[in-house]
Amino acid sequence: DTRRRSVLIPQLDFPERPNYEYQQPNVVDLEVSDEELIRISEEGILALSLLEMQTIREHYRKPEVHEARKSFNLPQMSPTDVELECLAQTWSEHCKHKIFAAKIEHHDKETGEKSTIDSLFKTHIMKPTEDMQEEVNWLLSIFHDNSGVISWSDNLNLCIKVETHNSPSALDPYGGAMTGIVGVNRDILGTGLGARPIANTDVFCFGPPNWQGNLPENLFHPSRVLSGVHAGIRVGGNESGIPTVNGAIVFDDRFIGKPLVYAGTVGIMPRLLPDGRESHIKTPAEGDLVYMIGGRVGYDGIHGATFSSLELTEESPSSAVQIGDPITQKKMLDMVLEARDLGYITCITDNGAGGLSSSIGEMAEYTNGCEIDLGAVPLKQSGLSSWEILISESQERMTVAVHPDDQNAFEELADLHEVEHSIVARFTTTGLFHVKHGESTVALLPLNFLHDGVPQLELESEWEETKLEQFIPPSAVD
């Protein structure tokens, strides 16, 4: 039959992408009442306490700050929204672990003893580990990189990182868990000069999947959280080529309100690179070019660090959960490891909590300064404001420092692997976190204030005598 047959092709109507226009940075007036400071923090999802807001206000009252800002045409006594958002991400509980670092007045009611604990982290985690490091030769890198590094053999180092992704998994079980596992994969990739992720692990704690009681509005049923989290971890690992080698699941009523989602990755790196450098030591220098490679920046993941530092409520924004793309990350991973072995990388870290504000801000501590151009950052869509570009946690991005002599070779390698790359900053020695958008300066923060200016939290704790009850195991019949 040679007669023509018509084929009906269904037509799909796709929504048009909204065309947002770029908005100039706003000035945030902090010379207001305490109540207004709290309102600014809460409505902006900044997760800053009143004391922290007051500390920021005091910074902008200093004459030396006025003088430094004058030459950059910045408001002298008030932060821009870019600066305030950057401080909020850097000072968030998610990034600073302020509870672990708090000064705690402790009262043991059982013995009557009172004591002061100046940072649980420093006294009960850092000090024992540092004491151990003095006695062994296999603890190579602790407490200052994306993961800890130990010597595994004469030729290989091993690194392990585990972190939680609880709030994102409560709002979007699939997306929250996927970005949790691919994010911790990037932590391994961003350790030292780059490690290869070889295995994933996880522990999940959910409410009972057969729960039949009431649930608050906008809270997913535990069975949906279970299936979504499991699928997100599985897909994130499989599409990145990294197997999940073990895990555990716990069910308990305590996890109905918020699940506990641990995602972990194991990585390996050669002890020495072909050029003789030790793989666990970053070597940036003034003038190095800072690239953002991999994915683009979008509206997803904005306020991820601050929202996860707050109590989960019905108003918690789902936009704080990032959108994962493991295949893009796989291409980037292969390219980074090849660049490492070719000697192109001087420093590397991932774009996780806080986005570029965190990654470049942390790397800048090595040289004591940086200058960022947000206008050079590739975007998923137009119209993002300066502060949104700086703190967005859009996934599949690494920040990589390269010596200017290796610029062409690095870019050719990225093109070969089809990995997008853009020079977004340079390292300086000014002591400043200097952010521009094109020719205009939109943020100017001293690095020491950005990283060490957060006031120490003060807490009280009590220990009461425990009353143990006899445990009667259920019978086999029960």
What are the residue ranges of the model-derived segments?
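Short catalytic-loop micro-motif centered on adjacent basic/acidic residues
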Residues: T346-T349, T399
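Short amphipathic beta-strand starts and helix->beta connectors
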Residues: L374-W387
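Short amphipathic alpha-helices within nucleic acid-binding modules
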Residues: D406-E412
